[in-house]
């Protein structure tokens, strides 16, 4: 039944109000989960922290699906009436325009309409155009900073800073932690030859929690200079202490990396805090900052906005990404923009014993799992519209012939039905060919550490070929090829059986039974392709990775529910306090 003229405005107002209320319920529950973090830290409940992280990630899609179902029931046959949805959008604007972080609500509205209509590209009459969604354009004033004046002593200054950390757990040795922070700051300032004294310290009041650590985030301010400041806190069985102090841009960047789990930080108004973080890390995209503080959907919206704003002036074309051709994914990039696009191929070679649904599940696993600073955050996008002229001819041919299930054409446009977007890195095999011996050795050492770090968080990369790892600007080795990724706990790590006869020894194929989940670590070294210089470097530091015993030991710890810490800092990057 068609709506009457008097019914339509009333229904539009009701639907807009329901959408606003749904977001408020989502946001309230999101913040309630986030506010568990201090208690998890105080009680050293690390398993609880991990559960909270997954629960919070799943919350957004849950509320979108529930709201769509409710609105579909309310609207009935008019659920796809675009004129009605245009009216709902206008009513929605009136309801949210005075609210803080209004752009978050617009993003939520877009999620609803895109679910209803399966929008390809942009439909301005029923959604908010991403290019116009700037969450930092109208940031409401918000008193979220604490300022501590330097009254002549760094020790007194940081005594006041640490006293501002409210925690039910006792300090293990408060005075020692104060001395450590003051000493580290003084030492770093000396390396900068900075003679002008720090006049104050500015700290974000809400604490940043990430699994087993709490972080106090702010900056040290002097006359005409400032330094970023992050103080990492650890809660041991004997109490809380300062674990490390970070004042270097590179170290702060690693902490707020696209490879780490999201922070739990309860910000009443997000935009103002994002502006401050952007000042601390001016080279980090706003999209990554939104994502790493846990606002993943807004981070995704920002990435879309950054991309399409860049395309308005870009002169280059999309081309295949550097590196070897993928067997499961087609990977391409825009050289002038620092991301790659990954599309699932229509067909996989016989040696890949997987189907498309398996690949989707692997990426979903990574999205919800502790990435340990070693897995790139892959954002899933659907129904992206690009002018076909932006694609290199060879790439366009490959997409048409090998990814027809993920792309289609509409007039002069190419529609990408499904893809993942990730930060671009230099493939490790290419990096090792391009750098000198010292840099290559450091990369090989970090490659081995990456395998360890992933194992500690119950992730086995599966395919350890160097081409499946990348190197970031901070020279961190990151894994980014997920089609063979699995849980360490699901594998059976075995020693190679000894040959029982000369005939077995001479066979070209495997003569013993191998189950799907069998892994033989002794064979890893054959596939890595290290030269005669780098092989001993790897074996000296990480030789135990080639033993089934080491992997079974990790499995035992996982089954015992041990939380093995993989921190965004360490002796090789920043000094860590004595915190045994």
Explain the meaning of each model-derived region:
Residues 341, 350, 460-515:
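Catalytic activation segment of kinase domains across protein kinase-like and atypical kinase folds
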């Amino acid at each position: 039944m068609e709506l009457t003229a008097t019914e339509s405005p009333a229904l539009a107002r009701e639907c807009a109000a329901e959408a606003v209320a749904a977001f408020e319920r989502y946001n309230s529950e999101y913040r309630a989960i986030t506010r568990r973090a201090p208690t998890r830290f105080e009680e050293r409940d690390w398993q609880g922290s991990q559960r909270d992280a997954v629960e919070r990630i799943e919350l957004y899609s849950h509320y979108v699906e529930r709201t769509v179902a409710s609105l579909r029931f309310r609207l009935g046959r008019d659920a796809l009436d675009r004129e009605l949805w245009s009216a709902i959008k206008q009513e929605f604007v009136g309801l949210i325009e005075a609210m803080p972080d209004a752009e978050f609500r617009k993003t939520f509205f877009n999620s609803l309409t895109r679910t209803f209509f399966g929008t390809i590209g942009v439909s301005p009459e029923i959604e908010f155009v991403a290019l116009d969604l700037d969450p930092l354009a109208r940031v409401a004033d918000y008193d979220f900073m604490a300022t501590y004046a330097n009254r002549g002593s760094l020790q007194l200054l940081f005594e006041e800073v640490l006293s501002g950390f409210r925690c039910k757990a006792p300090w293990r040795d408060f005075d020692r932690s104060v001395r450590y922070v003051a000493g580290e700051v003084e030492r770093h300032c000396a390396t900068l030859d900075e003679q002008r004294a720090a006049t104050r310290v500015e700290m974000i009041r809400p604490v940043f929690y990430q699994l087993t650590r709490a972080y106090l985030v702010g900056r040290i301010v002097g006359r005409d200079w400032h330094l970023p400041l992050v103080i990492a806190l650890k809660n041991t069985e004997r109490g809380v202490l300062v674990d490390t102090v970070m004042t270097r841009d590179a170290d702060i960047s690693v902490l707020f990396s696209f490879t780490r789990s999201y922070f739990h930080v309860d910000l009443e108004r997000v935009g103002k805090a994002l502006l401050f973080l952007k000042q601390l890390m001016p080279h980090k995209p706003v999209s990554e900052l939104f994502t790493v503080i846990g606002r993943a959907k807004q981070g995704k919206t920002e990435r879309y906005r950054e991309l399409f704003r860049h395309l308005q002036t870009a002169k280059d074309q999309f081309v295949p990404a550097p590196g070897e051709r993928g067997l499961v994914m087609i990977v391409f990039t825009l050289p002038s923009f620092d991301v790659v696009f990954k599309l699932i191929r229509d067909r996989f070679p016989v040696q890949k014993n997987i189907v498309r649904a398996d690949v989707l599940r692997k990426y979903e696993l990574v999205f919800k799992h502790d990435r340990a600073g070693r897995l790139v955050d892959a954002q899933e996008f659907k129904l992206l519209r690009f002018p076909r002229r932006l694609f290199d001819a060879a790439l366009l041919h490959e997409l048409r012939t090998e990814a027809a299930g993920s792309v289609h054409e509409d007039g002069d446009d190419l529609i990408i039905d499904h893809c993942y977007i990730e930060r671009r890195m230099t493939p490790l095999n290419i990096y090792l060919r391009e750098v000198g011996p010292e840099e290559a050795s450091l990369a090989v050492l970090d490659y081995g550490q990456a395998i360890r770090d992933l194992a500690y968080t119950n992730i086995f990369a599966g395919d350890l070929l160097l081409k499946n790892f990348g190197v970031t600007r901070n020279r961190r080795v990151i894994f980014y090829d997920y089609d063979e990724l699995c849980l360490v706990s699901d594998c059976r790590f075995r020693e190679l059986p000894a040959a029982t006869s000369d005939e077995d020894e001479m066979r070209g194929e495997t003569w013993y039974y191998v189950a799907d989940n069998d892994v033989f670590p002794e064979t890893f070294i054959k596939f890595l392709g290290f030269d005669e210089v780098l092989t001993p470097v790897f074996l000296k530091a990480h030789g135990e990775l080639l033993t089934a015993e080491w992997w079974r030991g990790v499995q035992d710890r996982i089954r015992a529910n041990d939380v093995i810490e993989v921190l965004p800092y360490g002796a090789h990057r920043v000094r860590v306090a004595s915190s045994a």
